[in-house]
């Protein structure tokens, strides 16, 4: 880990040194001169709550506008592609290609696919000519790979679909928890899973998945078998498909060094790949590798639905492109260049990277079913039960932001470009948009206002509500069927409830003002909404600890804060940026998450007493070990397994009493 961090820091400093030299003669726009940036930061300090990473984004954006798109994309990649309103009203990275030019966004509703490799080359070259430092894109790719290898499995998506279904499942053989996913019916990879009998855990070395027998309800935990990949692999996440008895490891895969003369030409241009490696686990003692697929770029995210894996990676183009060698600027899937017809061109006239999408039938795991690549300048995605929405924020004049969307349908592995569109404002995260009955509902922030927008299946605007919560910004959101909820925070902190039953006439039903704010929302049955966030002093804005809230949403026009629990010894949780870390099961009536205290990380397990309208603490235990992977709480029957890297600890879910543990 230390060596990886040193390498990352060296690469970052090298890139910054090059930027400094190349930007010495670059004229800086007035809005980004130091005195104006100081004013911007001072303005932010005066607000009651300012997310710490936003200051970093302001600085990163300044560098990007002076030096070019590539470095901003580097910053976006390591910040989880968070769109910030604090630089020119939106995602500075999207406007960095030419600091004095606002890019024209196409009004076409049709996604254009490339007619030739030459056309693709021109799009990328245009961006690189604007950026002035495209030669460092290759370094960005390689450095990103090192950092991703050292990080936890990404969610990425970040946060990010309708759902909030319980994180548990009941079968004839018993009950057990499942990964907390964004969209009901669409599975996501994780670093720990269970099939109700065994635990599957990625070790800290990121190359091994242990299969663990929990023994007598956690009193006799034993390692049963393992799957270990080669040193060129870094396991990001994995899936366990109980129907087909398959385990699929989604990995980052590093190619041989460029100096290796035996290396192929395609490997030279694609140093980092994303791989899906599938194992047959019918004999749990002896898993058998069945197949592998690869695609260009660093791992971004993945989904699994109906036995098909959908793999997403980010491939950044290098500055050493050769026009008549598409391999130097076109992604590869299973070692072959993607066809030009599979590449979706952006709604603006330039692009610096691809979101590469491949589908795999896990019953035939050595080949892909279909693939697409979305040429862009960096964005995020939301995956519904039928469609993939890829969105980017584009800076416009007068601190305005426009979010562009591209819609790709998926069904049984087949991918189809459907439509593109745009809306005012930027999205806080992927919980801020949702597909329902063919329509797409979005909550966005644009400069100092917030909006509700509804688009039809062709991404044409049906309706919108504007000028909401002036001077505030959206912190969290959630949709359930014909209703939506979002929390804003700035000087006041309301929870808005929205009636979406008539797509042509959405209505704001209520606005509940509450102290503090919820950074993560999760439906707890049909009439309750769970919020995990922070309690703050209403006058000073100083944090007073982690706040757990249960909202009564029985009457959407009169939402009530039914109960609140403040954990004043915790100063934050993982819920806001890693929703997979949350256990929320209304059927089991258990809420689990990890938080941070002065002594390290603490795992909390709560239950909610609906009759007395209060939270009750079952477990609040300091987590052993020191892992960078993230903490997971998984239950089988009535035993909770808290997993921290190579350490598993078992607790009784009713009493909180420890039952056993193991170090893998």
Annotate the PLM regions.
Residues 1-49:
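Disordered, charged N-terminal biogenesis/targeting segments of membrane/secreted proteins
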Residues 8, 56-58, 67, 465, ...:
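Generic secretory/membrane-interface signal
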Residues 17, 59-67, 88, 147:
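N-terminal non-cleavable signal-anchor helices
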Residues 33-37, 77-664:
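Beta-sheet-rich non-transmembrane sensory/scaffold domains
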Residues 33-44, 55-82:
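Single-pass transmembrane signal-anchor helices and their membrane-water interface zones
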Residues 49-55:
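Bacterial N-terminal signal peptides that target proteins for export
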């Amino acid at each position: 880990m230390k060596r990886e961090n040193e390498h990352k820091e060296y690469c970052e400093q090298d890139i910054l040194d090059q930027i400094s030299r190349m930007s010495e003669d670059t004229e800086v726009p007035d809005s980004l001169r130091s005195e104006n940036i100081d004013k911007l930061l001072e303005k932010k300090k005066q607000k009651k709550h300012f997310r710490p990473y936003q200051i970093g984004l302001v600085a990163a954006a300044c560098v990007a506008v002076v030096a070019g798109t590539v470095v901003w994309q580097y910053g976006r990649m390591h910040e989880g592609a968070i769109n910030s309103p604090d630089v020119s009203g939106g995602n500075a990275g999207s406007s960095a290609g030419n600091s004095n030019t606002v890019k024209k966004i196409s009004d076409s509703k049709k996604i254009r696919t490339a007619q030739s490799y030459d056309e693709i080359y021109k799009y990328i070259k245009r961006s690189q000519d604007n950026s002035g430092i495209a030669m460092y894109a290759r370094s960005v790719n390689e450095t990103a790979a090192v950092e991703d290898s050292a990080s936890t499995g990404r969610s990425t998506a970040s946060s990010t679909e309708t759902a909030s279904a319980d994180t548990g499942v009941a079968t004839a053989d018993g009950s057990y928890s499942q990964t907390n996913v964004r969209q009901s019916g669409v599975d996501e990879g994780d670093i720990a899973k269970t099939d109700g009998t065994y635990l599957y855990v990625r070790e800290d070395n990121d190359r091994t998945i242990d299969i663990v027998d929990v023994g007598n309800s956690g009193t006799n935990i034993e390692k049963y078998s393992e799957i270990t990949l080669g040193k060129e692999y870094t396991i990001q996440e994995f899936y366990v498909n109980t129907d087909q008895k398959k385990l699929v490891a989604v990995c980052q895969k590093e190619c041989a060094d460029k100096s290796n003369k035996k290396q192929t030409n395609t490997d030279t241009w694609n140093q980092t790949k994303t791989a899906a490696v599938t194992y047959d686990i019918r004999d749990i003692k002896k898993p058998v590798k069945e197949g592998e697929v690869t695609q260009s770029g660093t791992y971004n995210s993945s989904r699994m639905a109906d036995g098909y894996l959908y793999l997403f990676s980010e491939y950044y183009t290098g500055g050493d492109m050769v026009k008549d060698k598409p391999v130097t600027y076109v992604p590869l899937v299973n070692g072959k260049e993607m066809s030009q017809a599979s590449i979706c061109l952006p709604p603006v006239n330039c692009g610096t990277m691809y979101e590469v999408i491949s589908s795999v039938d896990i019953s035939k795991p050595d080949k892909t079913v279909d693939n697409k690549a979305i040429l862009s300048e960096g964005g995020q995605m939301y995956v519904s039960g039928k469609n993939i929405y890829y969105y980017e924020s584009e800076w416009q004049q007068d601190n305005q932001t426009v979010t562009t969307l591209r819609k790709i349908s998926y069904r049984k592995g087949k991918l189809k470009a459907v439509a593109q569109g745009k809306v005012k404002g930027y999205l806080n995260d992927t919980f801020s948009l949702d597909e329902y009955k063919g329509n797409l509902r979005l909550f966005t922030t644009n400069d100092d206002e917030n909006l509700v927008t509804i688009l039809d299946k062709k991404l044409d605007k049906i309706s919108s509500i504007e000028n909401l919560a002036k001077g505030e910004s959206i912190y969290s959101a959630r949709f359930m069927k014909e209703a939506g909820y979002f929390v804003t925070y700035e000087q006041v902190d309301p929870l808005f409830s929205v009636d979406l039953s008539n797509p042509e006439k959405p209505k704001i039903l209520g606005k509940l003002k509450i102290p503090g704010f919820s950074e993560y929302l999760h439906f707890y049955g049909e009439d309750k909404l769970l919020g995990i966030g922070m309690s703050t002093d209403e006058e000073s804005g100083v944090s007073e600890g982690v706040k757990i809230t249960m909202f009564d949403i029985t009457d959407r026009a009169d939402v009530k804060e039914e109960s609140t629990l403040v954990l004043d010894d915790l100063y934050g949780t993982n819920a806001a940026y890693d929703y997979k870390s949350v256990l929320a099961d209304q059927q089991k009536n258990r809420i689990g998450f990890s938080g941070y205290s002065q002594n390290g990380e603490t795992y909390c397990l709560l239950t909610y007493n609906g009759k007395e309208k209060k939270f009750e603490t079952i477990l609040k235990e300091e987590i052993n070990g020191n892992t960078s992977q993230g903490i997971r709480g998984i239950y089988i029957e009535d035993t909770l397994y808290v997993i921290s890297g190579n350490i598993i600890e078992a607790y009784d879910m009713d009493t909180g009493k420890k039952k056993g543990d193991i170090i893998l």
